[in-house]
Regions:
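Cysteine/selenocysteine-centered motifs that mediate thiol-based redox chemistry or coordinate metal-sulfur cofactors
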Residues: 23-58, 158-178
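Short, well-ordered, mixed-charge alpha-helical segments that flank or form enzyme active sites
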Residues: 1-2, 9-14, 40, 48-50
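Short, P/G- and charge-enriched loop/turn segments at secondary-structure junctions
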Residues: 15-18, 27, 114-118
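Conserved hydrophobic/aromatic beta-strand scaffold that supports enzyme active sites
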Residues: 3, 28-30, 100, 130, ...
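Active-site beta-strand termini and strand-to-loop segments that position acidic
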Residues: 31-34, 133, 153
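CN hydrolase (nitrilase-like) catalytic-core segments centered on the catalytic cysteine
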Residues: 43-147
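A short, polar/charged loop-to-alpha-helix boundary motif
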Residues: 5-20, 145-163
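Short hydrophobic alpha-helix segments
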Residues: 2-4, 141
């Protein structure tokens, strides 16, 4: 379909990607497929609302977010509900369905100089899901089983809903400064 390179690179105990990767410079892309105009935000990019809005402004009818995310057992918080709500918010604010795919399983972190010689593991919490255009979850996978989830959406009805809300009509990009 095309090339898009991950823009935001995480750097923490689990995801030390800045050591290995350079941020992408392609911007956020959308592609026309046989079924819909789609946008894809890889991993950490999905947490940034600018990613979703950038693709929606380009006409994305469905947003796809493939990722590998987990938080247990070292962190005292389960980040899965927060992750899910962020993706639901991207859907609701842009009136587009979201397909969020996450892996399951465990990765061991071997001691190294880069991680302070810590030994740990990371459990990926699965929970892949599909929303409708308003952010409502229509189907969701479990946390620990490999599963396929799917959903259906009436893209013409979604487009009508986007127009009726006026979110794109009433935007004021000339005053959005960083």
């Amino acid at each position: 379909l095309g090339i898009y390179r991950k823009t935001h690179i995480p750097d923490n105990h689990y995801y030390q990607e800045k050591f290995y990767f350079t941020p992408g410079d392609t911007g956020f892309k959308v592609w026309d497929t046989k079924y819909a105009r789609i946008g894809v935000g890889i991993c950490w990019d999905q947490w940034f609302p600018e990613t979703a809005r950038g693709m929606a402004v380009q006409g994305a009818e469905i947003l796809f977010y493939p990722t590998a995310i987990g938080s247990e057992p070292i962190l005292e918080v389960d980040s899965m509900p927060h992750w899910r709500r962020c993706m639901q918010g991207h859907s609701a604010c842009n009136i587009v369905p979201v397909v969020a795919a996450n892996r399951i399983g465990e990765e061991k972190v071997a001691p190294s100089e880069a991680n302070g010689h810590q030994e740990s593991s990371l459990i990926f919490y699965g929970s892949s899901f599909v929303t409708d255009a308003t952010g409502e979850i229509v189907t969701q996978a479990s946390r620990d089983k490999e599963e396929i989830v799917y959903g259906e959406s009436d893209l013409d009805a979604d487009a009508d809903l986007r127009v009726s809300w006026g979110l794109f009509r009433d935007r004021r990009p000339e005053i959005y400064k960083s």
